[in-house]
Amino acid sequence: MKRLVPLSAIAAVLAMGGAAAAHHSGAMFDDKKTLVFENATVKEFQWSNPHAWLEVSVPTATGPQDWSLEMVGLGGMRRAGWKFNSVKPGDKIKVTVNPTRDGSHGGRADLVTLADGKVLRGQGPVRPNGAPAE
C-alpha cells in the first residue's frame, strides 16, 4: 500500500503530460508566415490567463476584417512590458502576426507597435541574446 500511492501519483502526472503539452502547442499557427497590419484598430484587449487576447479591426480593399490574436499569459506579458491598459479600444496600432494555418482571421500576435512608437512583444520577453524567453 505504501508503494501504491506514490506509483498512482506518478502515473497520474505522466498521463496528464500529453494534455499539458497539447495545450501549449503552437501548431495551429503558421510561424513561417508573417502578416503585418499597419493600421489596425483595437476593438478589445482581454487581459486574462491563460492567454491574453487582442481583437483588432484591419482595413482591407473589401472593407474591415476582424482578427483575434492570441498572446502569452499575464506573467509573460508583464515581463515584456505590457500593462492591463497598454492598449484600449480605438487605439491605432501596428501588429505583426503569425496567422492560423486554417485561414481563419486569427493568429498569434508577435510584435505590437503602439501609437507612441513603443514596441511590445505579444509572445513574452526576449533574452539578452535575442532568443525568446521560455
What residue ranges belong to the model's regions?
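Bacterial N-terminal signal peptides
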Residues: 8-17
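Short boundary/loop segments of OB/S1/cold-shock single-stranded nucleic-acid-binding domains
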Residues: 21-35
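Short aromatic-glycine-enriched beta-strand elements
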Residues: 48-58
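Short nucleic-acid-contacting surface segments enriched for D/E, G, S/T with interspersed K/R
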Residues: 79-94
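OB-fold/S1-family single-stranded nucleic acid-binding modules
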Residues: 100-123
